[in-house]
């Protein structure tokens, strides 16, 4: 059964289709929004062998012409050179402003292709077909697009909403356990920031999700997308409430920078650690009971996920150096670093009233005996 989450943004409204076998239905799902029967697809070297043929056969069956560009897999692809390569591909394929381009892949491909679509001819339409759990519940929804800079993650980009999102639950079966759990870090985030009953549901159903229960996976994706859509509609360009979606990300982005955006730490793993540290910081500031971070850590550990900096392999910078890396975060306003803290599970809020010493103590404790 396919479920649809509508994102009501006026003339930029779109639907998120969630269900099994959607890749095989891509022609009938994308066809109605095309001005002409032609699309340009961008994917990566991991996704292409697994899913590109199913997509192109579905498009062909609907009489839709297509061309494909396969980029290297990995975070390093979110860069100027690959953005330039993608735009050259679109221009060579004579993509017009009314045309549609397709992002087939995880968050890296979705972010890159969305940004290319935003700046090509001052904006062309694009469809997200997210192939990772992380992309299905987070990066494919809401219109944030962009690339990384040497100074930090996602510092160059634009808000550009997709015209449609196809979240095929079946493609999640091809993920490694590590990649699935990395995406699960973003799923847990939704329960932690504003939906305690959903977090309870995850405590009960997390094992089934990891084991491949398609019905449970569909429900987790639906609830996550519904929550994100509601927040995006209230605050599309992150002037207020949307910042709540960055729960755990201030810590996460510093950890990603410290590990060189490498496979030492996947984004969703950083989010999971970041959420645990955000709740620990909240407890030390007296904002929430100690029971809250303990419960967060217990669930993440039960799922076999990283919860502390000491879980990251290799040498890490000092707590002071990590705090300095946090200063490159997009949530810095007038030089003031904003944190997403919590009063309880499901009750996150934005504040700049966070003691540097408390954050340093949390970082030091999380590093364990490795703290310098």
Give each language-model segment a name.
Residues 1-100:
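ATP/NTP phosphate-donor binding region
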Residues 108-115, 136-137, 254:
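Short glycine/serine/threonine-rich phosphate/pyrophosphate-binding segments
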Residues 115-208:
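A glycine/threonine-rich phosphate-anchoring loop and its flanking beta-alpha core
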Residues 8, 33-34, 94-96, 119-121, ...:
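Solvent-exposed alpha-helices and their adjacent loops that cap or buttress functional pockets
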Residues 200, 204-320:
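Active-site segments that bind and position negatively charged phosphate/pyrophosphate groups
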Residues 92-95, 161-164, 170-177, 185-197, ...:
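Generic secondary-structure signature for well-ordered alpha-helical cores
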Residues 3, 185-187, 287-372:
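C-terminal charged capping/lid subdomain of soluble metabolic enzymes
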């Amino acid at each position: 059964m396919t479920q649809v989450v509508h994102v009501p943004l006026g003339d930029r409204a779109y639907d998120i289709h969630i269900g099994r076998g959607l890749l095989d239905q891509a022609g009938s799902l994308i066809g109605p929004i095309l001005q002409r029967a032609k699309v340009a697809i961008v994917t990566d070297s991991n996704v292409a062998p697994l899913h590109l043929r199913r997509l192109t056969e579905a498009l062909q069956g609907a009489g839709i012409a297509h061309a494909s560009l396969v980029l290297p897999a990995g975070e390093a692809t979110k860069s100027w050179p690959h953005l330039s390569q993608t735009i050259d591909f679109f221009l060579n394929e004579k993509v017009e402003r009314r045309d549609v381009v397709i992002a087939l892949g995880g968050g890296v491909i979705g972010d890159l292709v969305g940004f290319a679509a935003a700046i090509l001819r001052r904006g062309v339409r694009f469809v997200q077909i997210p192939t990772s759990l992380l992309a299905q519940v987070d990066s494919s929804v809401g219109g944030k697009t962009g690339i990384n800079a040497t100074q930090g993650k996602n510092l160059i980009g634009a808000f550009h909403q997709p015209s449609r999102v196809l979240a095929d639950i079946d493609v999640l079966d091809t993920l490694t356990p590590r990649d699935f759990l990395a995406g699960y870090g973003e799923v847990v985030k939704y329960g932690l920031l504003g939906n305690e009953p959903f977090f309870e549901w995850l405590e009960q159903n997390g094992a089934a999700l990891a084991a491949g229960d398609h019905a449970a996976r569909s429900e987790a994706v639906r609830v996550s997308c519904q929550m994100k859509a509601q927040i995006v509609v209230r605050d599309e360009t992150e002037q207020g409430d949307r910042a709540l979606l960055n729960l755990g990300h201030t810590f996460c982005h510093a950890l990603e920078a410290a590990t060189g955006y490498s496979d030492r730490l996947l984004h969703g793993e950083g989010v999971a650690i970041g959420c645990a540290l955000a709740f620990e910081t909240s407890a030390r500031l007296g904002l929430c009971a100690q029971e809250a971070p303990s419960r967060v850590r217990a669930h993440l550990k039960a799922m076999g996920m990283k919860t502390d900096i000491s879980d990251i392999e290799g040498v890490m910078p000092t707590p002071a150096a990590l705090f300095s890396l946090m200063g490159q975060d997009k949530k810095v306003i007038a030089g003031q670093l904003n944190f997403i803290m919590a009063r309880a599970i499901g009750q996150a809020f934005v504040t700049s009233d966070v003691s540097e010493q408390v954050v340093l103590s949390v970082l030091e404790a999380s590093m364990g005996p490795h703290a310098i």
